[in-house]
Amino acid sequence: MLKNLRETMRTAPIVRRGTYNYFIHPISDGVPVVKPELLREVIACMVKNADLDVDKIVTIEAMGLPLGAALSTMTDIPFIIIRKRKYELPGEIAVHQTTGYSRGELYLNGINKGDRVLIIDDVISTGGTMKAVIKALEKAGAVIKDIVVVIERGDGKKSIEELGYDVQTLIKIDVDENGVKILGCIDEECQ
């Protein structure tokens, strides 16, 4: 099922940022080009595996935008974008996030107490962003029904599971200076 995702991961360029081997991929970076067949495949896999008995889909700017829009369109479930910009709307919640290579503020709007939500994102590495998002959703009184992330790298998934939440990832990878190695994926035809 994830033929395009597997192939594009295997051929993803690697750049060095300090001591960090950063992979460049259409799902996580939007470059060089996001092909519709790749996005369609990823969203179809999310539809097949995610708990869609929710009121809202929650995703994180920037690369969560195409995922959220496509999944919302396919399921008719509204989506919320956690933004990098403050809007100062009533009830806005600041989300302080720290990742393996950045930190900053994000802002959550549009969540009501009792909303059942599905969180989706492009990558989980350290889990820093996801922890911050979970904390903000809990503060807003949302019920987190499921978390689905396209690409798993590092121990971030484990750190979220230690908080009591399951995280489904479509593909698990490791990255070194030689490239991306696929360690597993949600479908049976991974390798």
Swiss-Prot record:
Q: What is its EC number?
A: 2.4.2.8
Question: In which pathway does this enzyme or protein participate?
Answer: Purine metabolism; IMP biosynthesis via salvage pathway; IMP from hypoxanthine: step 1/1
Protein location: Cytoplasm
Q: Name one GO cellular component term.
A: cytoplasm
Its primary localisation, in coarse terms, equals cytoplasm
One GO BP on record is:
IMP salvage
Q: What keywords were assigned to this record?
A: Cytoplasm, Glycosyltransferase, Purine salvage, Transferase
Indicate the enzyme's highest-level EC class. Answer: transferase
- What Gene3D superfamilies does the annotation carry? 3.40.50.2020
User: Which CDD domains has this protein been placed in?
Assistant: PRTases_typeI
Q: Which PROSITE patterns match?
A: PUR_PYR_PR_TRANSFER
Catalytic activity, as annotated: IMP + diphosphate = hypoxanthine + 5-phospho-alpha-D-ribose 1-diphosphate; GMP + diphosphate = guanine + 5-phospho-alpha-D-ribose 1-diphosphate
- Identify a single GO molecular function assigned to this protein: hypoxanthine phosphoribosyltransferase activity
Family the UniProt entry places it in: Belongs to the purine/pyrimidine phosphoribosyltransferase family. Archaeal HPRT subfamily.
Q: How does it assemble?
A: Homodimer.
Could you tell me what this protein does?
Catalyzes a salvage reaction resulting in the formation of IMP that is energically less costly than de novo synthesis.
- What's the protein called, per UniProt? Hypoxanthine/guanine phosphoribosyltransferase
